[in-house]
Amino acid sequence: MASRHISVSEQSRPMLPRHAKLRFDETRQRWVILAPERVLAPDDIAVEILQLCDGARSVAAIIDTLALKYTADRAEIGADVIAMLQDLADKGFLTEAREKTP
């Protein structure tokens, strides 16, 4: 179940690895990332970003979406998004979509 290490950039297409699931926990009344023997409870902003990490969207597209939604400075949002995604990737909670080969 080892995830390959990724370096998050605007070109990355992040997604949760197969062993991790973003779910709403009714008991805790909050979103959690479930992975084997681990649970992470991201804050509301992280959940919103993670819901956009579908392996199809690039980090640049995610940043654009959030900057438009919150009418915020793209560079500031970009730095925060990349830092958060890199932290999750370093902890094994995020991977990058691979191109399908025939």
Swiss-Prot record:
The keyword S-adenosyl-L-methionine does not apply. Pathway: Cofactor biosynthesis; pyrroloquinoline quinone biosynthesis. Pfam families: PqqD (PF05402). GO terms for molecular function: quinone binding. One of its GO terms (biological process) is pyrroloquinoline quinone biosynthetic process. Keywords: PQQ biosynthesis. InterPro entries: PQQD (IPR008792), PqqD_bac (IPR022479), PqqD_sf (IPR041881). Functions as a PqqA binding protein and presents PqqA to PqqE, in the pyrroloquinoline quinone (PQQ) biosynthetic pathway. Monomer. Interacts with PqqE. Belongs to the PqqD family. This is PqqA binding protein. It comes from Rhodopseudomonas palustris (strain HaA2). The lineage of its organism: Bacteria, Pseudomonadati, Pseudomonadota, Alphaproteobacteria, Hyphomicrobiales.
